[in-house]
Amino acid sequence: SLHDALPILLIFFLCNVALFVSAQSHMEKGLQSISRSSTEAIINFLAGDELQGREAGFHGSRVASEYIVSLLQWIGVQPLNESYFQPFEAYRKERQKKGRLEVHPDSIAKLKQEVHQKLSMRNVLGMIPGKNTKEYVIVGAHFDHLGIDPALDGDQIYNGADDNASGVSAVLQIARAFVASGKQPERNVIFAFWDGEEKGLLGSKYFVQTCPFISRIKGYLNFDMIGRNNKPQQPEHVVYFYTAAHPVFGDWLKEDIKKYGLRLSPDYRAWDNPVGGSDNGSFAKAGIPIIWYHTDGHPDYHQPSDHADRLNWDKIVEITKASFLNMWKMSNEREF
């Protein structure tokens, strides 16, 4: 009778619900862990005056790198190597006008006459090991900025909230989303935080030049400035650069915006020769397919006025979600 069949039907129904929940849950668990409150906490710390503008080779950027490591440990992401830090050295000549520094990663021998000071820098590198330990994908952002210029009247600290505390917050939240998903990715996922970008992409160049598995890196996703409105009337605007030879990168974002109702209106830019003034250039030169999120220029770019209170927080969250979905596919899809 139906009465006797009810428990069986109920069990069947519950099993189906469980199947449905597990089918949707891993990626969506990750997606749900991305929050505006975490975005704000990370950026407000990194772009605070105490961090003195995070100039590469100076105290503020070292504090920033320690902070990033402490969050990776808390999230549960292991270091890529024995340490989370990848130290490297750069050399500088005299202080230039405007307190900017010129840095030469070349051999010190060539520069002996000119070297004014040696700068120690360090990338931060975490990893979630994949099932296929031969292949890697990387998501990264630079954490350094322009430091302090004592010659300026008024505000002398280049806080770099958009450039690039915004990008750092995205990489950290994507790391947490992978852990929160509860599912091991197919490929190794590296979470990279570059030092010395403002001085000539030094950290990412050093990583690419010294990486023993460069030929097994399948893709790199970059953030540089993902927090501002280029035009007030277009709060959802973001430029989405990607390697033209991989048109599926464009399809991924279009599909996910529809599927998850993400509030983004991307300017899709397929690049035949992806270079550009950010760390994606270091990877593109090595022939690695790239994606780069960038919300475009604004009057506070490279000014002491690049403050956290001018950011579009919701946009950063939406970009973080979209790029987590990109990385989920990049780490799990067989081909792209």
Predicted regions located by residue number:
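N-terminal capping segment at the start of a domain
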Residues: 28, 33-63, 75-85, 89, ...
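Second-shell loop/turn segments in exported
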Residues: 26-33, 49-59, 74, 111-115, ...
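His/Asp/Glu-rich mid-to-C-terminal helical/loop segments that flank catalytic regions of hydrolases
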Residues: 26, 299-336
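Short, small-residue-biased leader/transition segments that mark boundaries at the very start
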Residues: 1-6
